[in-house]
Amino acid sequence: MNKKEIAEKVDNLLGNRPEIIFAYIFGSFVEDGPFNDIDLAIYVDKDQSLVKGIFYEIKLSNTLEEKIRIPVDVIRLNNASDSVIYRATKGLLIKNNDEEKRVNFITLHWKRYWDFNHKIQEHITELKHGSR
């Protein structure tokens, strides 16, 4: 299977999971060149009992790996850091059941990422050159 076929298969497998509101494939899979696994970022409906507990991502990863025969790393965007959210949501959107929720989520976290990233860069510059 090529990358397009793999992404479509993952999309189809996620399609029957109403607890997943939106999902992205990111990492080496969406970049030019070879890949060893699929990085999948999901945003889930926290009110669904199915997603409560620490093993949801592991179970989803195992299910996907069985079907597509490629290792799949699943992260839950609901609990991720702003930098992980920023990187993941620059990837390939493969599922989107709520555009407004997705855009609001991304807007909030990208803003926090850029605000925080700016402060980090200031501190790095200060450390390199001493405080003035």
Describe each PLM feature range.
Residues 1-22, 30-34, 49-132:
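Catalytic core of pol beta-like nucleotidyltransferases
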Residues 41-45:
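Short hydrophobic/aromatic beta-strand micro-patches
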